[in-house]
Curated annotation (Swiss-Prot):
Keywords associated with the record: Hydrolase, Metal-binding, Metalloprotease, Protease, Zinc
Lineage of source species: Bacteria, Pseudomonadati, Thermodesulfobacteriota, Desulfuromonadia, Desulfuromonadales
UniProt entry tagged with the keyword Metal-binding: yes
Matching PANTHER family: DNA REPAIR PROTEIN RADC, UPF0758 PROTEIN YEES-RELATED
Biased amino acid composition, Basic and acidic residues: 7-19
Name under which the protein is recorded: UPF0758 protein Ppro_3582
Annotated residues for binding of Zn(2+): H178, H180, D191
Domain MPN intervals: 107-229
Intervals of motif JAMM motif: 178-191
Signal peptide range in chain numbering: none
Family: Belongs to the UPF0758 family.
Length: 229
């Protein structure tokens, strides 16, 4: 029989802990346990065990867990379709909230503001993600676009992919954002070359590249602040 969380000391149970101390006091695995709700009798895993396995499978990256499909989630023994559907629903709701949050921001005024917006989303990712913020003539947010996923190079991050949506949305400027899975935001020579290439392409198209911000683990690097752009 699956060892139930109900049998645990009350101060260790996720639900009781949240009610007493607030949701922020829970670990990622404990929060997932509340979404998963029950353990699995066949495997003897508790809901927290399943939550921990999910986090481990995706390298502690909530972004990559959130983008996983049902087949990837149910690959874990004990994670049936109902549990996987609950996890997908929670991440989809969080993604929609994140989008609303972006819409509610009047404008980006500093590199720090960009970092504050993106670092929780990107800091634990095992892969590099390259995103573009589209801005109007008053630096107000139009939307965000993901350009690539995986190792950055000039063949993947092509001006065509970066500026295609900018042209469609009549954007006046863009801010480039990507993460370094190592946690060190120091730009590589490839990063610098890509940025210069995109800036030159933007100048030809009349779309300004305002900054390129690299997200690290608790820190960031702004090409403008560093004097690279």
């Amino acid at each position: 029989m699956c060892p139930g969380i109900r049998e645990w000391p009350e101060d260790e149970r996720p639900r009781e802990k949240m009610l007493r101390k607030g949701a922020a006091s829970l670990s990622d695995a404990e929060l997932l346990a509340l979404i998963i709700r029950t353990g699995d009798t066949a495997t003897g895993k508790s809901a927290i065990d399943l939550g921990r396995e999910l986090i481990s499978l995706f390298g502690s990256s909530l972004r990559e867990l959130g983008s996983a499909d049902m087949a990837e989630i149910t690959a874990i023994k004990g994670m049936g379709m109902a549990k996987a559907a609950g996890v997908k629903a929670a991440f989809t709701l969080a993604s929609r909230f994140q989008g609303r949050r972006l819409e509610n921001l009047d404008r980006f005024t500093s590199p720090r503001q960009v970092f504050d917006y993106f670092h929780y989303e990107l800091r634990d990712c095992r892969r590099e993600y390259f995103l573009v913020l589209l801005l109007d003539g008053k630096n107000r947010i139009i939307r965000r676009v993901q350009v690539s996923e995986g190792s950055l190079n000039q063949s993947i991050v092509h001006p065509r992919e970066v500026f295609c949506q900018a042209v469609k949305e009549s954007a006046a400027a863009v801010i480039l954002v990507h993460n370094h899975p190592t946690g060190d935001p120091t730009p590589s020579q490839e990063d610098i070359a890509i940025t210069r290439r995109l800036k030159e392409a933007g100048e030809i198209m009349g779309i300004r590249v305002l900054d390129h911000i690299i997200i690290g683990d608790g820190e960031y690097l702004s090409f403008v602040e560093r004097g690279v752009l």
